């Protein structure tokens, strides 16, 4: 099983599937289609049925029930795209038999995965790790999840003695830019419950997510030759800087944890005439979330009072909501996942997602979908890695969930 997981993850990782928030297509990038078509062929090869890809790149497949009992149809999902935070081109995964200490990812560039900066690394002594080469992200988020689902389905097909109901599988595009389920056909997927395999370290089990919004704030100034600019030039960049300075410094991602929400300035672009600032807003509490959006709007109003109505324009949209509200009424699905982990001597770590998953949106579309660990660490950057042993445990958790649904029906 470990060899299958290694081969699958490395193969998937080498396909550049970074999404693009500026694209209007679904999937947002051609590379996602490349992986989707590859996975379609692989699903057929391992023996899955009802394999379909729609015009938007949503790949679905079925493992038919092998039981005559009335077992709820469950689903497992992972996303094919990787994050835009760091380059995902020419990913060159490395396999490390880790014996402790620091890992030199790239000797030439002096990129070191250190136990000082990442103390959790020490706990992986004796594990086989898949790392980056220090120049790209790895893409274990969420290609480790794809590998785990694929390997679990292959195992169940090869072991028909394991009783299970109908299992649906889906691989989806554009999760990293918040559009994952936007065109997902829940009725076509036709599962009663589902799980995303999109978490991090061993034991993560999550059914709470952020409420999330994104804001694009455009500042308009007046560009004049600097030699004759007195009393004429209005520098949009300076107005943007004044706006940014209004946000509480301690309410940023680098200063928050647990249930603490934040404002996150993700990018700035512009010149004297026009500057664009992009924020994301996050909070687990719905009321606090709405208050944060109101605060941003108030800061914009303050700018208008000082510089005029046309000096600033805010476009803000909600991206997803906390899935807890939709999962708590069917919390048995969380308990089943927890039991599956405990049967493998895994201690479930039930904590809120400081982010979102496709399950955040799917839960509001009528498909309650908690999130399960992949075994990965340090997603979205050059220090990303995943434990092969913990990938195997994630795979066995998927198998265990399928077995428990059958046993409890």
From Swiss-Prot:
InterPro entries: ArgE/DapE_CS, Bact_exopeptidase_dim_dom, Peptidase_M20, Peptidase_M20_dimer, Peptidase_M20B
Keyword annotations from UniProtKB, A to Z: Aminopeptidase, Cytoplasm, Hydrolase, Metal-binding, Metalloprotease, Protease, Zinc
A biological process term (GO) from this entry: peptide catabolic process
Recorded catalytic activity of this chain's protein: Release of the N-terminal residue from a tripeptide
Keyword Zinc included in the entry's annotation: yes
Pfam family, one: M20_dimer
Residues the entry annotates as binding Zn(2+) 2: 141, 176, 380
UniProt GO MF annotations: metallopeptidase activity; tripeptide aminopeptidase activity; zinc ion binding
Active site per the UniProt annotation: 81, 175 (proton acceptor)
Record's subcellular location: Cytoplasm
Chief location of this protein within or outside the cell: cytoplasm
Xref: PANTHER family: PEPTIDASE T
Protein function: Cleaves the N-terminal amino acid of tripeptides.
Name assigned to this protein: Peptidase T
């Amino acid at each position: 099983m470990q060899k299958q997981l290694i081969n699958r993850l490395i193969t998937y990782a080498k396909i550049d599937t970074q999404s693009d928030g500026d694209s209007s297509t679904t999937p947002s990038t051609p590379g996602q289609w490349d992986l989707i078509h590859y996975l379609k062929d692989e699903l057929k090869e391992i023996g899955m049925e009802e394999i379909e890809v729609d015009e938007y790149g949503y790949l679905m497949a079925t493992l038919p029930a092998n039981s005559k009992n009335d077992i709820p149809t469950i689903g497992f999902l992972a996303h094919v795209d990787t994050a835009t935070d760091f380059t995902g081109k020419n990913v060159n995964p490395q396999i490390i038999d880790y014996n402790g200490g620091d890992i030199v990812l790239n000797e030439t560039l002096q990129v070191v995965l250190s136990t000082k900066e990442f103390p959790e690394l020490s706990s992986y002594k004796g594990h086989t790790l898949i790392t980056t080469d220090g120049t790209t992200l790895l893409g274990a988020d969420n290609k480790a999840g794809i590998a785990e689902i694929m390997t679990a389905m292959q195992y169940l097909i090869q072991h028909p003695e394991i009783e299970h109901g109908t299992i649906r599988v889906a691989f989806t595009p554009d999760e990293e830019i918040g559009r994952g389920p936007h065109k997902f056909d829940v009725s076509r997927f036709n599962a009663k419950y589902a799980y995303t395999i999109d978490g991090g370290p061993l034991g993560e089990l999550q059914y709470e997510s952020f409420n999330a919004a994104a804001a694009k704030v455009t500042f308009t100034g007046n560009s004049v030759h600097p030699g004759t600019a007195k009393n004429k030039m209005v520098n949009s960049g300076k107005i943007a800087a004044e706006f940014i300075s209004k946000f509480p410094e301690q309410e940023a991602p680098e200063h928050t944890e647990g249930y603490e929400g934040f404002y996150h300035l993700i990018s700035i672009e512009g010149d004297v005439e026009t500057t664009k600032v992009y924020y994301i807003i996050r909070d687990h509490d719905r009321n606090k979330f709405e208050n944060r959006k109101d605060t941003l709007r108030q800061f914009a109003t303050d700018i208008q009072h000082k510089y005029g109505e046309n000096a600033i324009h805010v476009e803000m949209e909600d991206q997803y909501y906390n899935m807890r509200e939709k999962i708590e009424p069917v919390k048995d699905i969380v308990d089943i996942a927890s039991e599956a982990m405990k049967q493998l001597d895994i201690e479930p770590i039930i904590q809120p997602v400081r982010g979102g998953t496709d399950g955040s949106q799917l839960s509001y579309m009528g498909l309650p979908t908690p999130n399960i660990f992949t075994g990965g660490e340090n997603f979205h950057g050059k220090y990303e890695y995943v434990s092969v042993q913990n990938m195997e445990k994630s795979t066995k958790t998927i198998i265990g969930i399928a077995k428990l649904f059958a046993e409890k029906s």
